[in-house]
Amino acid sequence: MAPSGPQPALPILVVLLGALLLGPGNAQTSVFPPEVILPRGGSVKVNCSASCDQPISLGMETPLPKKEILPGGNNWKMYELSNVQEDSQPMCYSNCPDGQSSAKTLLTVYWTPERVELAPLPPWQPVGKNLTLRCQVEGGAPRANLTVMLLRGEKELSRQSAVGEPAEVTTTVPVGRDDHGANFSCRTELDLRPYVLKLFENTSAPHQLQTFDLPATPPQLVSPQVLEVDTQGTVVCSLDGLFPVSEAQVSLALGDQKLNPTITYGNNSLSAKASVKVTAEEEGTQQLLCGVMLGNQTQETRQTVTIYSFPAPNVNLTKPEVSEGTEVIVECEAHPRAKVMLNGVPAQPPGPRAQFLLKATPEDNGRSFSCSATLEVAGQLVHKNQTRELRVLYGPRLDEKDCPGNWTWPENSQQTPMCQAWGNPLPQLKCLKDGTFPLPIGQSVTVTRDLEGTYLCQARSTRGEVTREVTVNVLSPRYEVVIIPVVAAAVILGTAGVATYLYNRQRKIRKYRLQQAQNGTPMKPNTQATPP
């Protein structure tokens, strides 16, 4: 509570009393102190005096509670006024033989405001927009000495006089990003220093400001334009220029399906990524929505997603396993709006169905028939493939390519006999010399004289058997010594013969041309065929 006002001491009053008393003449009433400032509810002592020595009457008129203190003198009285709640002017009066008179003292009551309140700030304030601060002040006196300040932290934004009851003070300030989290408050100052008192301050509770900056551009939404039923797609929504980005929220939804995104925050940007899986109930056109919410504003982007159902095409064979020579129908069928293509089939009009007739051969065993179906969805082509394999049953085969009929190997060399039998089912193969000595097919062996000879290779399966003779020749070192010079001599003689023939031919041509030139006969091109 503010301190009490000054109380005049009795000795001082008595001393001053004589100075205030006037000599004989016109009647005059005096009051001391003439002015007093005191806290509301306080008390004060006031002296009333008359100019004559023996006043007929001397007193005070006031609505305030009063009582006379001290014995007083013939021409003065002292009163104590208590519970002073508001400004007042008590009046001292006197009635002397030469006339009546009166005098007033001015009581000024001071008190600090009962309520200093800053109006609530908006939950979110857009950056770049002006903010209006409003402060209400109830009570406080004297108003001439009461001012109201609006503050940002301790920085003074505005100072105004308190006018009216309650007094309301407003000011408008621009808001930037650096104002986010700043505290704003209202403060009153009751300056009684001119009355030799002090400065009284009252401050409201601070309010914290939250600012935000949401760009006018909509979020960027990246997603597939088409989605197949029971498949999963990825949706990414991003936006730059957000402040404060940590307070931004993202909402992603496909139709009635709310997505659960994972949000990654940058300095002033965010990216929300979510997986979406669609069902047959959602087939058709759906709206994909991305909303970024910050403060009390939202930016949205919408995109159309087409959800479709497209089963893989069916590839059907008359029978997946047939005997050699059997006719097989290969058929591919897909979605009614799809176009199919069977590999290895002559071109057919585009449509959802294709087929052809095949006469199975051993070469068709293990053959894959692939069907490709294409469907147009929302301007995009989507593809599905299906493959079936045909198994052809045929008897054993042994041919020169996979089972050579003659091998010639040097003695003591390392060789691997190879003979592959074909058939479905795969036949068993064995090669025997004289019905007992086996040829180690597929195994690395050291060539010896015992390996030489003719072998009967037999391939057998449930669909029959086939045989083939295979001869193994073993070259001994002596045979190699004889055969090598013979082969070398043959090569030399052959080369010499060819060279002699070419020389004689060129010589005859030159001779013929010379004769023709001498006889004046035009030359004809030589069309003689080159001898083999």
Curated annotation (Swiss-Prot):
It holds the Pfam family Ig_2. A motif (Cell attachment site) lies at residues 152-154. Monoubiquitinated, which is promoted by MARCH9 and leads to endocytosis. Disulfide bonds join C48-C92, C52-C96, C135-C186, C237-C290, C332-C371, C403-C419, C419-C457, C431-C457. The chain crosses the membrane at residues 481-503. GO terms for molecular function: integrin binding. Residues 28-480 are extracellular. Residues 515-532 have a biased composition (Polar residues). SUPFAM superfamilies: Immunoglobulin. GO terms for cellular component: plasma membrane. Residues 513-532 are annotated as: Disordered. CDD domains: IgI_N_ICAM-1. Residues 41-103, 128-193, 230-297, 325-378, 412-464 form the Ig-like C2-type domain. Belongs to the immunoglobulin superfamily. ICAM family. PANTHER family: INTERCELLULAR ADHESION MOLECULE, INTERCELLULAR ADHESION MOLECULE 1. This is Intercellular adhesion molecule 1. The lineage of its organism: Eukaryota, Metazoa, Chordata, Craniata, Vertebrata.
